Amino acid sequence: MTHYIQGQWHTGNGHDVTSINPANGETIWCGKTATAEQVNAAVEAARAAQFDWFMLGFDARLAIVEAYRSQLEANKAELAETIAQETGKPQWETATEVGAMIGKIALSAAAYHKRTGTEANDTPAGRAVIRHKPHGVVAVFGPYNFPGHLPNGHIVPALLAGNTVIFKPSELTPKVAELMVTLWDKAGLPAGVINLVQGEVDTGKALASHPQIDGLFFTGSSRTGHLLHQQYAGHPGKILALEMGGNNPLIIKGVQDIKAAVHDILQSAYISSGQRCTCARRLYVEQGEQGDALIALLVDAVKQIKVGPWNAQPQPFMGSMISETAAKGMVAAQANLLDLGGKVLVELTHLQAGTGLVSPGLIDVTAIDVLPDEEYFGPLLQLVRYGDFDQAIKLANQTRYGLSAGLLADSREDYDYFLARIRAGIVNWNKQITGASGAAPFGGVGASGNHRASAFYAADYCAYPVASVEADAVSLPATLSPGLSL
């Protein structure tokens, strides 16, 4: 069980790949990658199944998607444990991920009707009707940080709209993808409607470049997303939806309850071991005694964050990063900031060789004139002290990204001022910036995306509008146009 093509499981014909539990280094999955020929077979299966899937009608498609929801409910403990083992995230967090997957079904059905439903109006020229049709065959590229929830957020609305799907998950989380597709199979999805191909860069390239796909929905790094954008620049007939990363700012101004502010900072910067695209990377704190007090409390709180394996009891706040390589990358990022003039307030350390376990870090980078505009994808927060609110907003906007941003402030006027000037697709006030609603769009501007917001707006890129003017019979107008005679 590695690849799922035309309703059947197949072993790969490529090279061996394994999945490692990053918290202990144990191998938990083995398989072989899909070759270009197997990718082609998956696309052909999706193409052959697409029209019949569309012609089933929305209600019949929804019934199968709701059967998938029932499968998620029945298997939520196994799915949460699989996500925890493969990503290193603690069990409490993976349980919430599965809950979000279950909730996505109702949200996607509501979004289908609200964003891409059918509307008819009588006009003097006839009945004007707006309908939406699926693009056809779409590829979904999933990330490792939310290997269930994020691809699910593409797959469910794509299927509801009448598309067929080829799912290519992260090579770091193949076991989660295999279980997800198993549940789709148990839900009764017709053969060819969803297909799974596992692999690394070569598999992804074979799928992304296939001439018979009509669209690609990607969640992942800005670098890969930009390469896909360049590749698709000459293909205006294909829909491309990119959800990429961010170098996200969080500003603190005039907050009396500093303990509550510190809590929101921790949730913004360190949840999921800093491996959420919306995590705060830069923290702006006012100069002065109030800011000093907040930072002192923050330093103490960061030092007390519990880190441990996915199954530790009592449960930790932070689990493992996705790999030892990722952990070493964060140590290197911290060293780079220190070389530029940063000052350690709390040192990020690699806790155990052979694992992705790291402690959270906090670096004062106020003395660095120009911060690297990089998404350090881990639990490393950069602190900047500021003296003027306008200066803080200006610094916050000094990034090519534009995913999430936040303000913790007691003044509504300060928030209105901030909201009008900050450049980001997700802007929160007095809430963690890693908190997003599935009933709202999710996406950013700049290097964070290509104006194809997901979540509630995913329906928008899963279908295209069809405008019609209709009448029940052919009829002559009351008056012919000048120059005509009949």
From Swiss-Prot:
* Gene Ontology MF annotations: succinylglutamate-semialdehyde dehydrogenase activity
So, what pathway does this thing act in?
Amino-acid degradation; L-arginine degradation via AST pathway; L-glutamate and succinate from L-arginine: step 4/5
Gene3D superfamilies to which the protein is assigned, alphabetical: Aldehyde Dehydrogenase, Chain A, domain 1, Aldehyde Dehydrogenase, Chain A, domain 2
Keyword match Oxidoreductase? yes
Q: Which reaction does it catalyse?
A: N-succinyl-L-glutamate 5-semialdehyde + NAD(+) + H2O = N-succinyl-L-glutamate + NADH + 2 H(+)
Keyword annotations of the record = Arginine metabolism, NAD, Oxidoreductase
Q: Which InterPro entries match?
A: Ald_DH/histidinol_DH (IPR016161), Ald_DH_C (IPR016163), Ald_DH_CS_CYS (IPR016160), Ald_DH_CS_GLU (IPR029510), Ald_DH_N (IPR016162), Aldehyde_DH_dom (IPR015590), SuccinylGlu_semiald_DH_AstD (IPR017649)
Statement: the UniProt record of this protein carries the keyword Oxidoreductase: yes
EC id:
1.2.1.71
- Family membership: Belongs to the aldehyde dehydrogenase family. AstD subfamily.
Q: What does this protein do?
A: Catalyzes the NAD-dependent reduction of succinylglutamate semialdehyde into succinylglutamate.
NCBIfam families documented for this protein = arg_catab_astD, PRK09457.1
Q: Which PANTHER family match?
A: ALDEHYDE DEHYDROGENASE-RELATED (PTHR11699)
Q: What is this protein called?
A: N-succinylglutamate 5-semialdehyde dehydrogenase
Gene that encodes it: astD
